[in-house]
């Protein structure tokens, strides 16, 4: 007789085998109607799976995060059901969930059009209205194989052929349509009501460009229509904030086919880049980092010694000269060890913090490239700290402070922290991993920070802390990281002399705050919608005259401001002042300075902001107080 323990600690004893559906019904009709799956001893199961043993149970509904994911997965199967009804010759591949949605990869002789997408969506709605039961059946591998052979589904057959013999497989039956999945799925289509098909794109089978190009139908699904509407609104706002559109409108940068994944920075965009670089350089200097510069191309032998060649050679750009093969560096760490290795180091010299604005190249797939967010050439705010084991925790603790200081300067106050622990494939002893993970966790705990584990997601050479920003649309961007590395110093023979006069390998901490300048600027463009804080704005001030008579005074003011180090432009076009104000407001310039006969006579300037605030006529000295305060705040809006 199974004894079931509920989340509140209540225990219920049942006379025989039961299901999640039975337990939900025993608790009450409301829960029975809302239940879509269950969690049995932390494992998600369908509500119809029998339980004949003692277990801790949680009923999953659409209010749970897992419930929404199950709903999305079930919608992927509904795509399959609808497509097979409308296009019987289509062959179904895979249909997993992704962030905020799901997709299904399909092989079909004709290209799906927007009209086809609308037709599929309508058929899904018709199927939902039928309120049919989704039936799960656990079958042998051979039965599953024969099922999909009979249904002429070659991709399903290929998947099953890669499953070991003797394994069982779950089949999910949507009336006449059958799919396979680990599950769980909703028990009835009545739980599926808030969705939208988003788009169709191409995708290679198994992500391999040597395989067939399939058609991928993307969709999103939510627990209710309110959440769906909120998501669509966020997408529309994100579309307006697309850094590629704003970048073009503000003349910040462009990319082109002749240099895929490489950024052409325009003067306005390069201005932002330079301000960002100067700020980070000042922060590093204030925290006792030493800036270095290492070569772009390094002989293959160094990458083989470091271990990067075996793991990343397909992602490297290479070149040959005089019968030697070089890799354009994809990261900076092996080169920083070469600098550390020049000259004998003592424990008294540690920690040594080497920083570089390192230009790196990685051969990302062309289909993955996306404006500034995913590029092939990028600059990291990279640094490596060489320290003793005893110094690891304090160095990590100091870096955490640094990360929060920098992010706050851009207005990011909500930081998500995760500690990635040892993966299955790793180097180093369990003792070293225990010590490394403990040092990172204690550094986080000493700050009183909320954080969570990412089990098994550490690098092969050591655990890491990841810092992610949440932007104004509640999107999460992983940017900063600090990683403990006991492996590379050993591989590349880094040594220092310890207190006993013996040679010892330093611990190496890999760390970055922004991640890459390109991606971080892309994040800033979208977060600010191009309305950069004054300290970052490409043009901080525009000076305009009302008539030609005011040109000389405008030129003099512009020169004064430029000489004081501000970024200023002069507009003496023969246009109406209202037209110029509107144009420069749309161009997101923070301060608009206007000089007419009255201002010139009184020795004042009329000041307007891009938000439309008319600050009246004030002296230059008064304006500079306002301007300097705005700049000093950086992006700290709190």
Swiss-Prot record:
Sequence positions that bind Zn(2+) = 333, 384, 510
Pfam families linked to this entry: HGTP_anticodon, TGS, tRNA-synt_2b, tRNA_SAD
Q: How is the cofactor bound, as the UniProt entry phrases it?
A: Binds 1 zinc ion per subunit.
Molecular function (Gene Ontology), one example:
metal ion binding
Which InterPro entries does the entry link to? aa-tRNA-synt_IIb, aa-tRNA-synth_II, aa-tRNA-synth_II/BPL/LPL, Anticodon-bd, Anticodon-bd_dom_sf, Beta-grasp_dom_sf, TGS, TGS-like
Q: Which GO terms describe its cellular component?
A: cytosol
Domain (TGS) spans 1-61
| EC top class named in words | ligase
Catalytic activity reported: tRNA(Thr) + L-threonine + ATP = L-threonyl-tRNA(Thr) + AMP + diphosphate + H(+)
Catalytic, as annotated region: 242-533
Q: Name one GO biological process term.
A: threonyl-tRNA aminoacylation
Enzyme Commission identifier(s): 6.1.1.3
Cofactor entry: Zn(2+)
Localization per record: Cytoplasm
Keyword entries, A-Z: Aminoacyl-tRNA synthetase, ATP-binding, Cytoplasm, Ligase, Metal-binding, Nucleotide-binding, Protein biosynthesis, RNA-binding, tRNA-binding, Zinc
Q: What does this protein do?
A: Catalyzes the attachment of threonine to tRNA(Thr) in a two-step reaction: L-threonine is first activated by ATP to form Thr-AMP and then transferred to the acceptor end of tRNA(Thr). Also edits incorrectly charged L-seryl-tRNA(Thr).
Which family, according to UniProt?
Belongs to the class-II aminoacyl-tRNA synthetase family.
- Subunit relationships: Homodimer.
Q: Could you identify this protein by its name?
A: Threonine--tRNA ligase
State the organism of origin: Prochlorococcus marinus (strain MIT 9211)
UniProt gene name: thrS
